[in-house]
Amino acid sequence: MYKTIDLFSGIGGIRLGFEKYGCTNVFSSEWDKYARQVYEANFGEKPFGDINGIDPSDIPDHDILLAGFPCQPFSIAGKGLGFEDTRGTLFFNIAEILKTKQPKAFLLENVKRLTTHDSGRTFRIVLETLKQLGYTVYFKVLNTLDFGLPQKRERIYIVGFSDNIPFYFPEPINQYRPLGELLENDRDVEPSYFLSDTLKQKRLAALKKAPPTPSIWHENIGGNVSALPYSCALRAGGSYNYLVVNGVRRLTGREMLRLQGFPDDFEINIPYSQVRKVAGNSVSVPVIEATRKICSLLFPARSNKKGNWIYWRQDDA
C-alpha cells in the first residue's frame, strides 16, 4: 500500500486519481476555505491550512508527494539556479518537504506557462532544485483532450524518483467523450443559468460559421466568439463567464466537474461562484489516473532468473 500526501490539494483531484489504484493519503494541505469545504465533504478530512504554517518534519512519512503548486517567480538575486533560489515561494515548501521526508517519488502539476515563465528561468530552477535533491526527473505537457474528456487543457506534469528509474509518460488515447454525454438536459437546468435574449443574439451574431451541436461557445477578450464540440480550459477567473453551452446558458457546477473527470457522486456543497473557481483550479482526474504507473515503478514488481529486478515499463501497459 502506497502512502501519499496531497499538497495545494484543491478539491482533491490528484488524490482521487491515485486512490483509485490503492493509495492511502496521510496528509493534505489547502488554504482556500471553499476548496477545503468540498474536500472534507468528499474525503472525510479537512486539509491543513497554509503550508507555511507546518514544519516539514511534522508531516507523516509517505511514498509519493502529490502537488499542484502555483506558478511564481523566483528571486532575481539567485545565481545558482537551485534550491536557495526558491526561498519565499510555495515551491520552496515542496522542496523542503522532499528534502526532509525523502519520499520515493513525486508528481507535480502546473500550468503550461511554467515552462516559459520568466523566459524559462523559473522552470530551470524547479528542475535543477529537484535534481539537487537527488531525484531523477521527467516532465511533459499533457492535454486533457487527449485523455478522454472534451476539454482542451494543457498542463505540465513533473515526475521524479529517488532512484534512477526509467519512466515514460502515458501516450494520448486521441479520443474524448462526446460533449453531449457530459451536459445536462436544458429542461433540468434552473432558469438562472440561461442568458438574456440580448446576450444570446449578440453572441450568435459574432459567430463566423454555423455552430456544431452540442457545443460550448467561447468569447475572447476581443469579442470574437467560437463554438467548439469541446470546452476550452476551465478557468478560475472572470474569463470563465465566457463559456456558454450552445450559446444559451452557463455551465452548471456538475457539468464543470464532469469536464474535469469527477464522478457524479462527488459532493458539491459550496456556492456556484466558488464551484467555478475550484473547478477551474482543479486537475483533470483521467490525466492523473493515466500516470498511475508511478505506483508500479516505486517498488520492484518481480525478479528475473538472474535475480535482477524488472520494473514496469511503458510497453507493459
Curated annotation (Swiss-Prot):
Record GO terms (molecular function): DNA (cytosine-5-)-methyltransferase activity; DNA binding
SUPFAM superfamilies, per the entry: S-adenosyl-L-methionine-dependent methyltransferases (SSF53335)
Active-site residues (renumbered): C71
EC code(s) of this entry: 2.1.1.37
InterPro entries, per the entry: C5-MTase, C5_DNA_meth_AS, C5_MeTfrase, SAM-dependent_MTases_sf
Single GO biological process annotation from the record: DNA restriction-modification system
Keyword DNA-binding belongs to the record: yes
NCBIfam families: dcm (TIGR00675)
Family named by the database record: Belongs to the class I-like SAM-binding methyltransferase superfamily. C5-methyltransferase family.
Protein name: Type II methyltransferase M.NgoBI
